A protein has these predicted regions:
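Transmembrane alpha-helical segments that form the membrane-embedded catalytic/substrate-channel core
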Residues: 78-90, 120-122, 160, 169-172, ...
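Aspartate-rich (DDxxD/NDxxD/DxxxD) Mg2+/diphosphate-binding motifs
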Residues: 89-108, 141-145
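Membrane-interface elements of multi-pass transporters and channels
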Residues: 59-64, 93-101, 131, 180, ...
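Histidine-centered catalytic micro-motifs
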Residues: 86-95, 124-136, 234-241, 266-282
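C-terminal membrane-associated helical module and adjoining short loops/tails
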Residues: 180-242, 247-248, 252-272
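Non-catalytic, topology-defining segments of multipass membrane proteins
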Residues: 1-79, 114-217, 284-330
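Active-site-flanking alpha-helical
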Residues: 53, 94, 98-99, 112, ...
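Transmembrane alpha-helical core residues of multi-pass small-molecule transporters
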Residues: 75, 109, 113, 222-223
């Protein structure tokens, strides 16, 4: 799965890109400009989708009782997708790209997107910066998600079944609960718990006491199940099967983007992931433009691009049974 040297031409630097692919000074100023107002709209949109979806489900099942057999399962699955929206905007906040003012970025990014999505923003930021400094390195916090690929098809399905069943989600939830016992981690856990109280209260206002179960069934449970599946599929598509290198083309996959993938797995342009790893200071709104610059320079070639995510997942699950490594706990 690692691209050969014939697919990795040495064409940098150019007048617009540096040796590593980062934008040169003039282009950098253009690509790194802030998008404060647009991100206010993005945050409002995510909240509207979250609570609007559940409100619509409550209304439909009240008006048409027979629709519950379809409406609630569809809402459950779609709420798993909602956590991708929270996660990516929280990721922007971790890079301090959500708002140009750092205090506003951390305050709004924490309380409006990270904590509702069960993410401790400051702790996540520390780990995520280690990921960007040295993918696949000794301090890589996400290595257990995508190391040792390709694996067998059966192994991938076992991982996805654990995600879908809530087994993986329970590990994450247990870690959050255990954080209350730690003096250093407790402040993060309290903030997340406080945000969940607000979410639960909002859902109670939407559904009434007769639907007290909305938070555990349509917020917590999708986060523990559907979101785990989507997060794994996205994570392995970003870095699975690659290697530690200073050349980001060897650490990060390139996949042609589609509306389907952008809706379910890679919202807010996060699918242009190679561009993000080339320059993590570029806001998500500009990642397609940076990717276009990398292609125009000849640094990203058609040979390293997967036509869609399905083809990449097939490659990641293409190992023979005799080649499978004992990593079933991940």
């Amino acid at each position: 799965m690692i691209p050969g040297p014939e697919l990795l031409p040495d064409v940098l630097p150019t007048d617009r890109l540096t040796q590593t692919g980062r934008p040169a000074v003039e282009l950098r100023a253009e690509l790194r400009r802030s998008h404060n107002l647009r991100n206010v709209v993005n945050i409002v949109s995510v909240w509207a989708q979250s609570f609007g979806l559940i409100a619509l489900a409550c209304w439909l099942t009240t008006q048409l009782a027979w629709s519950a057999l379809v409406v609630w399962p569809v809402t459950f699955v779609l709420m798993g997708r909602v956590f991708a929206l929270y996660a990516i905007l929280g990721h922007e906040a971790a890079h301090r790209l959500l708002f140009s003012d750092k205090r506003v970025n951390d305050l709004v990014g924490g309380w409006a997107v990270a904590y509702p999505g069960f993410v401790p923003l400051a702790a996540y930021r520390r780990g995520h910066m280690a990921h960007h400094r040295d993918e696949f390195g000794p301090n890589e916090p996400d290595l257990n998600l995508y190391e040792n690929y390709p694996i067998t098809r059966a192994s991938l399905w076992r991982k996805l079944r654990r995600d879908a069943s809530g087994s993986s989600g329970w590990k994450n939830l247990k870690g959050l609960l255990n954080a209350f016992r730690s003096d250093t981690a407790r402040p993060f856990a309290i903030r997340i718990a406080a945000a969940q109280v607000v979410v639960a209260a909002a859902l109670l206002a939407i559904g009434g006491w007769g639907r007290w179960w909305l938070w555990p069934a349509l917020w917590l449970a999708p986060w523990m199940t559907v979101w785990r599946v989507l997060n794994r599929l996205r994570g392995i598509a970003e870095h699975g099967g690659l290697m530690r290198s200073e050349d980001r083309r060897l650490t990060t996959h390139t996949v042609r983007q589609s509306l389907w993938a952008r809706f379910w797995i890679v919202p807010f342009n996060t699918g242009w992931h190679l561009a993000h790893h080339v320059d993590s200071g570029v806001p998500f709104q500009q990642l397609p433009n940076l990717h276009g610059e990398l292609v125009a320079a000849g640094w990203v070639t058609p040979g390293v691009e997967y036509p869609n995510y399905r083809s990449l997942w097939r490659a990641l699950a293409s190992a023979e049974a005799t080649e499978r490594l004992p990593q079933e706990e991940n």
